[in-house]
Amino acid sequence: MALVHKLLRGTYFLRKFSKPTSALYPFLGIRFAEYSSSLQKPVASPGKASSQRKTEGDLQGDHQKEVALDITSSEEKPDVSFDKAIRDEAIYHFRLLKDEIVDHWRGPEGHPLHEVLLEQAKVVWQFRGKEDLDKWTVTSDKTIGGRSEVFLKMGKNNQSALLYGTLSSEAPQDGESTRSGYCAMISRIPRGAFERKMSYDWSQFNTLYLRVRGDGRPWMVNIKEDTDFFQRTNQMYSYFMFTRGGPYWQEVKIPFSKFFFSNRGRIRDVQHELPLDKISSIGFTLADKVDGPFFLEIDFIGVFTDPAHTEEFAYENSPELNPRLFK
């Protein structure tokens, strides 16, 4: 209720300051910030601008402390209602909060009811429009001076996502970097009501399920856990995905028990199981050192429970089997 009280009292700040600043973002939210930034100041016509300069010249020498000149007509003034914008922002976030409460109704054995009805299978990401692409971001070694390029767009008939580009392993000429050549596609961290950071709970599933079509290149599938510790931001769990090439789709099933633990791109000696109850994001990385064009088409990404897979962890990691790691 305190947050709602601050949100509804946002008009006090708007009346006190001439235009909203970044200090108001915690009260108004990102959507309202984008809305307010889209409002452009009206520009006077050349004729009116000259008349303004003439008026200002006539006012020189007067002993008026404050002079307010209205150079815009009533037709040019934008119809801005900050109260309405605040109400719309509050309604939007309360609608998200309602959806979160409904989605967390528990079913048999404590599992969400809609997942039980779907036989414990769930499509997490699918690509049927531009709003689905907005949930992802792409990056390459261009951020460190490399020459690789990567792009993401909708596939044919808007039924898939097409990740394509050119891979270049040429190291940047900066005198420091010795290796280069990677492209990646990473999902954005989900946000809930009032811009709260959310995570995915896949603890009732045991397999990652993808439907993809590639050009024969190997990809690295990376999963990151949700954490608030800065020291763990570079930690992830990875496994390989091999595409066949050709015009046919392939269904890829990767058990979560196969994902190995790494930090800053290096596989660690001490392995840990993937914490499925707090998944932050998933990504796909290409770094096979084969220069040239590439593509990867993705239909959907989901999770499901494979009853035939009973393995809990693929890597032996106990003090009895490897005491050197647990000294």
Swiss-Prot record:
Gene source species: Homo sapiens
The UniProt record lists the keyword Iron-sulfur: no
Name under which the protein is recorded: Complex I intermediate-associated protein 30, mitochondrial
SUBUNIT field: Part of the mitochondrial complex I assembly/MCIA complex that comprises at least the core subunits TMEM126B, NDUFAF1, ECSIT and ACAD9 and complement subunits such as COA1 and TMEM186. Interacts with ECSIT. Interacts with ACAD9. At early stages of complex I assembly, it is found in intermediate subcomplexes that contain different subunits including NDUFB6, NDUFA6, NDUFA9, NDUFS3, NDUFS7, ND1, ND2 and ND3. Interacts with TMEM70 and TMEM242.
Keyword list, A-Z: Chaperone, Disease variant, Mitochondrion, Phosphoprotein, Primary mitochondrial disease, Transit peptide
Keyword Mitochondrion found: yes
Transit peptide endpoints, chain numbering: 1-24
Gene (name only): NDUFAF1
GO biological processes: chaperone-mediated protein complex assembly; mitochondrial electron transport, NADH to ubiquinone; mitochondrial respiratory chain complex I assembly; protein-containing complex assembly
